[in-house]
């Protein structure tokens, strides 16, 4: 269950699981030709691996092609995905060749529209995913 604290919305792992399942359903219903998946570092890595496992689509071996689904956690300002497209524009003939999927899409603030999204987020709250929590131990606190 999403926990609201001030202007922040904290998602649980269960919330993420629901969003990933919803995104997987949209991916299979889209009939997109997807051969592999690539997660944008850092926020897109975990959802990308989850989608890869659920759908049995491999993670890319390093080469991004028009058949690669690019996954990120959120498309808020859209700048990350827009910059990614600019970086790879020589690889893609048209913007619609770039297949993108996100857990949350904020159309009211984004300059980029993802191909697929699990949830359209209309709140101005900042979304905090479980992998972004500051309550984890730092690497120095672990004893081997």
Listing of model-derived features with the role each one plays in the protein:
Residues 1-144:
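PRPP-associated nucleotide enzymes
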């Amino acid at each position: 269950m999403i926990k609201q604290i001030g202007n922040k919305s904290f998602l649980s792992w269960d919330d993420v699981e629901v969003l990933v399942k919803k995104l997987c359903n949209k991916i299979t219903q889209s009939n997109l030709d997807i051969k592999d998946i690539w997660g944008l570092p850092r926020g897109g890595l975990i959802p990308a691996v989850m989608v890869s496992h659920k759908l049995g689509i491999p993670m890319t071996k390093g080469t991004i092609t028009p058949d690669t689904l690019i996954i990120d956690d959120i498309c808020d300002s859209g700048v990350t995905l827009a910059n990614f497209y600019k970086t790879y524009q020589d690889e893609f003939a048209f913007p619609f060749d770039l297949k993108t999927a996100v857990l949350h899409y904020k159309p009211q603030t984004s300059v980029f529209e993802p191909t697929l999204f699990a949830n359209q987020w209309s709140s101005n709250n900042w979304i905090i995913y479980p992998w972004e929590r500051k309550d984890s131990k730092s690497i120095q606190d672990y004893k081997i």
